[in-house]
Amino acid sequence: MELLKERIRRDGKVKGTDVLKVDSFLNHQMDVELFAEIGKEFKRRFADREVNKILTIEASGIGIACVAAEYFHCPVIFAKKSQTKNIAGDVYTTKVESFTHGRVYDIIVAKEFLGPGDK
């Protein structure tokens, strides 16, 4: 997506040799108009697919996922990075390495929100 590439070139900041900071428009301060364009692009690319849920991980993915979900008219589920008291019972879990935090998380999603028929 050219709009996103241009925004990264203009406002992204390189830290060291392996980190691209996009916190001024993507994951700390969020440019909702940019997110809307990204959501439209997801809809265009997946227009021929049945999408009934969007799954992301907390925290940076939530904003874009919510805007994209408006174009697909579906709910968003986000994987949590830690167990909480209000998630009990059957859950999906896997390990995910966070490049920016330099650690591994055991992420979880309640099975009641993500089933075998979801796309």
Q: Where do the protein language model's features map onto the residues?
A:
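A glycine-rich, hydrophobic loop/mini-helix early in the fold
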Residues: F42, F72, F78
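Short glycine-rich phosphate-binding loop at a beta-alpha junction
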Residues: E50-E58
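Short Gly/Thr/Asp-enriched flexible loops that form oxyanion-binding sites at enzyme active sites
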Residues: G63-H73
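Short, glycine/charge-rich flexible loops or terminal/linker lids adjacent to PRPP-binding catalytic cores
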Residues: P75-K119
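Active-site-facing substrate-recognition patch
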Residues: M1-V51
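Short, flexible loop segments at the rims of nucleotide/cofactor-binding pockets, characterized by
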Residues: M30-L34, L55, E97-G102
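A generic local structural motif
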Residues: K40-F42, G63-I64, D106-V109
